[in-house]
Regions:
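Extracytoplasmic electron-transfer domains, predominantly the class I c-type cytochrome c fold
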Residues: 32, 48-50, 56-107
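Post-cleavage N-terminal segment of exported redox proteins
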Residues: 1-26, 77, 103-107
Length: 107
């Protein structure tokens, strides 16, 4: 009986620990999310629209704000206060942001 209770407790603990983990971004879904970004950002070439081209973004040393190109800094830019680009913090879900970043990493 004790063994059963311990096993159930361990299974519950593992389930709760895994439930909080975010899913990895999905490239195909990220491409769809990017459609909202495409009026201002280019991914086909290096030409600038209203915002910078995002082609090869994760191959660059720095973002336009001077910060190093990392997933965290790109997510922070997506969540920006709206001075440099529209404020997407409350528009896109965390999963959509992860999907978008996964897509941008393929460019």
């Amino acid at each position: 009986m004790r063994l059963t209770i311990c096993c159930i407790g361990a299974a519950l603990a593992l389930t709760l620990a895994c439930a909080g983990a975010q899913k990895k971004g999905d490239v195909a879904r990220g491409k769809v999310v990017f459609e909202a970004c495409s009026p201002c950002h280019n991914v086909d070439n290096d030409s600038r629209k209203m915002g910078p081209s995002l082609k090869g973004l994760f191959k660059r040393a720095k973002l336009e704000n001077g910060k190093k190109v990392t997933e965290e800094n790109v997510r922070s830019q997506i969540n920006s206060d709206g001075r440099q680009m529209p404020h997407y913090q409350d528009i896109l879900s965390d999963q959509e942001k992860g999907d978008l970043i996964a897509y941008l990493k393929t460019l």
